[in-house]
Amino acid sequence: AADGYARARGVGACVVTFTVGGLSVLNAIAGAYSENLPLICIVGGPNSNDYGTNRILHHTIGLQDFSQEPRCFQTVTCYRAVVNNLEDAHELIDTAVSTALKESKPVYISIGCNLPGIPHPTFSREPVPFALSPRLSNMMGLEAAVEAAAEFLNKAVKPVLVGGPKMRVAKASDAFVELSDACGYAVAVMPSAKGLFPEHHSHFIGTYWGAVSTAFCAEIVESADAYLFAGPIFNDYSSVGYSLLLKKEKAIIVQPDRVTIGNGPAFGCVLMRDFLAALAKRLKHNPTAFENYHRIYVPEGHPLKCEPKEALRVNVLFQHIQNMLSGDSVVIAETGDSWFNCQKLKLPKGCGYEFQMQYGSIGWSVGATLGYAQAAPEKRVIACIGDGSFQVTAQDISTMLRCGQRTIIFLINNGGYT
């Protein structure tokens, strides 16, 4: 749920019991780490007076060492704080929250269960407004990267743009739209970036996903003589088993703070949003790739309607889901079959889309639906979940009901964990 909340609001938090809660939530924290979501995991830790006493506490595995839990969190968080006294609590907590927001990763904060009841002079002060210093690009590196990229793309005959999932953590979606408007290139997104670029954009050609791309999208991307990928992740899922027909020498890869151009130079300390915004002012307008797409594109036919007593087919179901979508909707797709079916949905302006492609933990969507709906009550959340995944986290439905949420869940019996 904290994962879904962070997707809607920019940061999420969860509070759990020491060890039994911490190790239970570890899987969800790992998922948030993989998706670059700032999430604050707060643990009610042992009484500060129990440290160093060799006592064995409940909710542990019977060891006198209380460091087991923070060690488990080491590889799925960017910072861990164990608060055992009030003297440095302020500094540790501020550092943890700041690091989560700067790194866009989860952090772990364990607070001794006796500390909240102890008075301290700092509690009487007015809280200081929280602020972070903005990150800045190296201006010389930025200028050099933009100049090299503009030269690379302006000499291409049919260049394209492809948006990737790291545009979210880079806060570069608006800059990517600005670049798309300026250059006129055909624009695709990777599957895990669906929802980060407006699908009503005049030059949007769909999802680039190798052999399972949107119709005619792969042909345009893979036949281009230059492509710019903004924030890509090339894992076995997104590359369809590393089968993408791309050539490194044709690619500009833009990561949140680094730009690599073909087989040539790489430019560090260059923020993605600064680079894309500056590049938009340097590119020549070139709609060739989009015009090629427009020539070969054939609209998909609509499936035949089901007879009243006929079994409901998936393609007919998703035609009805498509008709339900509006700018006030958010689609949440579960791992498995729902990924592929939801990728085919055409998102109207303002419609959100979320799924967990990197980590792919079944059952993720139920909790994410709960958290997202709580964070964005003005949105109608539509979740598509397979029955196998639903069994893992179905208990979150009770919390949805308690909170009065108006989520729509399509529970799809697909015959297994697919």
UniProtKB/Swiss-Prot annotation:
Q: Which tissues is this protein detected in according to the database?
A: Leaves.
Q: Which cofactor does it need?
A: a metal cation; thiamine diphosphate
Q: Which UniProt keywords apply?
A: Decarboxylase, Lyase, Magnesium, Metal-binding, Thiamine pyrophosphate
Q: Which GO terms describe its molecular function?
A: magnesium ion binding; pyruvate decarboxylase activity; thiamine pyrophosphate binding
Mention one GO biological process in which this protein takes part, according to its record. Answer: aromatic amino acid family catabolic process to alcohol via Ehrlich pathway
* Reactions catalysed: a 2-oxocarboxylate + H(+) = an aldehyde + CO2
Q: What is this protein called?
A: Pyruvate decarboxylase 1
Q: Which family does it belong to?
A: Belongs to the TPP enzyme family.
Q: What induces it?
A: Anaerobically.
Q: Which sites bind substrate?
A: H59
Cofactor binding summary note: Binds 1 metal ion per subunit. Binds 1 thiamine pyrophosphate per subunit.
Question: Quaternary arrangement and interactors, per the entry?
Answer: Homotetramer.
Tell me the segments the record calls region Thiamine pyrophosphate binding: 337-418
Q: Residues that bind Mg(2+), according to the entry?
A: D387, N414, G416
The superkingdom of the source organism is: Eukaryota
Instruction: Report the enzyme's class at the first EC level.
Output: lyase
Task: Give the species this sequence originates from.
Answer: Nicotiana tabacum
Q: Which CDD domains does this entry report, sorted A to Z?
A: TPP_PYR_PDC_IPDC_like
Which Pfam families does this chain map to? Answer: TPP_enzyme_C, TPP_enzyme_M, TPP_enzyme_N
For this protein, what is the EC number? 4.1.1.1
Q: Which GO terms describe its cellular component?
A: cytosol
